[in-house]
Amino acid sequence: MTPHINAKIGDFYPQCLLCGDPLRVSYIAKKFLQDAKEITNVRNMLGFSGKYKGKGISLMGHGMGIASCTIYVTELIKTYQVKELLRIGTCGAISPKVGLKDIIMATGASTDSKTNRVRFLNHDLSATPDFELSLRAYQTAKRLGIDLKVGNVFSSDFFYSFETHAFDLMAQYNHLAIEMEAAGLYATAMELNSKALCLCSVSDHLITKEALSPKERVESFDNMIILALEMMS
């Protein structure tokens, strides 16, 4: 056990899908996994283990933002020996290259958070995903006929009051969307010699002001869940 996860050692499989929302974790477990079992519930941050097409896989919530995400990622790696961590979440698009319902594979993550500078002795850390996981995601998307969008994301500490005047600059540097965790996830996995990747489904477009309905959000997220489970199976 850890201060934030009350699962037993051995409850987590080496591969784990991460979601910010613990209710989404429960949804995935009930809809997509066989023999799903709740293994942790501290602070109502739920975790499950089960089978997908006969292969063991775990699910874990991580809350919102880099600080919360890195707590869970650190404990999963150091205490529960999780080797591959795949975050699946939503994001707000800032580039004309992507639209609503698109799935983005974050090949790099910039951030306005200071956490990686503290971690890397005030130098700029290149927060990037594991290549092998990225390749598997790309190849699986091709097999499933999913037009996976590939590019950078910006992990912000702010959900509200973000610097909207910076959107054009970010898009110029091939940043496709804004989310809140990838930079911390990648840095933690790099530090602890584990594999991580972030996939994000576009739920809102911050430039065009388009947004998915609640029903559309579920449907588009299901496509990403299937992609994530297939690439891990």
UniProtKB/Swiss-Prot annotation:
First-level EC class: transferase
GO CC annotations on file: cytosol
EC id: 2.4.2.1
UniProt: phosphate binding residues: G20, R24, R43, R87, I88, G89, T90
One Pfam family it belongs to: PNP_UDP_1
Residues annotated as site: Important for catalytic activity: R217
Domain of life per record: Bacteria
PROSITE patterns per record: PNP_UDP_1 (PS01232)
Gene Ontology biological-process entries: purine nucleoside catabolic process
Keyword Membrane: no
CDD domains (UniProt xref): PNP_EcPNPI-like (cd09006)
Reactions mediated catalytically: a purine D-ribonucleoside + phosphate = a purine nucleobase + alpha-D-ribose 1-phosphate; a purine 2'-deoxy-D-ribonucleoside + phosphate = a purine nucleobase + 2-deoxy-alpha-D-ribose 1-phosphate
SUPFAM superfamilies in alphabetical order: Purine and uridine phosphorylases
Catalytic machinery residues: D204 (proton donor)
Keywords: Glycosyltransferase, Transferase
Chain sites annotated for binding a purine D-ribonucleoside: H4, E179, M180, E181, S203, D204
UniProt GO molecular function: purine-nucleoside phosphorylase activity
PANTHER family in UniProt: FI09636P-RELATED (PTHR43691:SF11), URIDINE PHOSPHORYLASE (PTHR43691)
Subunit comment: Homohexamer; trimer of homodimers.
Family: Belongs to the PNP/UDP phosphorylase family.
Protein's UniProt name: Purine nucleoside phosphorylase DeoD-type
The encoding gene: deoD
